[in-house]
C-alpha cells in the first residue's frame, strides 16, 4: 500500500471513530444498525414522504438501517420489502430477499413479486465497492442508481416516490434528466449526516407519472 493510500485510510479511520453519528450507532445498536439511518431520518424530517400504510421497497438494504426506519414509519398497515446481495439480520415485519439486483433473473424475480402489489415508495442506498478510481466508481454508482430508477418505472404506482443515492460526476446530470422523465418533482438532498467532502447525494423524486 502506498504512503498516500495509507495516509488516506488513517484519516478516514480517524474521522470515522470521531463521527458523532457513528458514536450514536454504537449507543443504539438494537435500533440503529448503521449511520445511514440518520441520512434517511434527515430526508424524512424535511420531506415527510414515508407515511402510515405505505408499501416500501428497500434496495441495497443490508445491514437494515433503512428497512428498520421505514417499517416504523409505515406502521402495521404498511409493509416493507427489502433486498440485498449481502445477508441481513431479520427485522420484524420486513420481508427480505437475498440476491444481486444487477442479476437479470433476480431483478425480474423482484419485479414479478411486486407487480401485483401497490408500491408507494422505493428507497435505495445502493453503492458499489469503491476502487479508489474516481471515474470507475462514479460509473458503477450511476449504474446502480439507474437500476433503482428502472425498478421504480416497473413497479411504482401513480404518484409514488423514489429516494435513490447517487454521486456527483460526469454522468450525474444525464441521470437527473432521466429521473425527470418519470417523475413530476425532483429534489437533490444532501443530509447533514452525509460527510461534507463526499460526492454522495440523494435524489428524492415524487409524483410518478403514468
UniProtKB/Swiss-Prot annotation:
HAMAP family: RNA_methyltr_E
Superkingdom per UniProt: Bacteria
InterPro entries in the record: RNA_methyltr_RlmE, RNA_MeTrfase_FtsJ_dom, rRNA-MeTfrase_E, SAM-dependent_MTases_sf
One Pfam match: FtsJ
Reactions listed under catalytic activity: uridine(2552) in 23S rRNA + S-adenosyl-L-methionine = 2'-O-methyluridine(2552) in 23S rRNA + S-adenosyl-L-homocysteine + H(+)
EC numbers for this chain: 2.1.1.166
Subcellular location: Cytoplasm
Gene giving rise to this polypeptide: rlmE
Functional description taken from the UniProt entry: Specifically methylates the uridine in position 2552 of 23S rRNA at the 2'-O position of the ribose in the fully assembled 50S ribosomal subunit.
Keywords: Cytoplasm, Methyltransferase, rRNA processing, S-adenosyl-L-methionine, Transferase
Amino acids binding S-adenosyl-L-methionine: 64, 66, 84, 100, 125
Lineage, opening ranks: Bacteria, Pseudomonadati, Pseudomonadota, Gammaproteobacteria, Enterobacterales
Official protein name in the record: Ribosomal RNA large subunit methyltransferase E
Catalytic center residues: 165
Family: Belongs to the class I-like SAM-binding methyltransferase superfamily. RNA methyltransferase RlmE family.
One MF term in the entry's GO annotations: rRNA (uridine-2'-O-)-methyltransferase activity
GO cellular component: cytoplasm
